[in-house]
């Protein structure tokens, strides 16, 4: 079985039926100034049972493309958000 990428982030939006938008933060070193800066990217993840809410911290695993922009499937919910 091939290695599957895993991403960890915060749910920022419920983007439709069985879909959530997750904001993933990564830290990179700036090429010129050598300072660690944060970079953010949003991914659409597939949530089969509609169990996530806005603010939850989740882990998603890479899968085959489920739609034009959706290539990750929900693996687990690490922490629930405060609402």
UniProtKB/Swiss-Prot annotation:
GO MF, any single term: rRNA binding
Keyword DNA damage: no
Entry keywords, A to Z: Ribonucleoprotein, Ribosomal protein, RNA-binding, rRNA-binding
Record carries keyword rRNA-binding: yes
Listed GO biological process terms: translation
Gene Ontology CC terms: cytosolic small ribosomal subunit
InterPro entries, sorted: NA-bd_OB-fold, Ribosomal_uS17, Ribosomal_uS17_bact/chlr, Ribosomal_uS17_CS
Subunit structure: Part of the 30S ribosomal subunit.
NCBIfam families: PRK05610.1 (NF004123), uS17_bact (TIGR03635)
Protein family according to the UniProt entry: Belongs to the universal ribosomal protein uS17 family.
Function: One of the primary rRNA binding proteins, it binds specifically to the 5'-end of 16S ribosomal RNA.
Protein name, as recorded: Small ribosomal subunit protein uS17
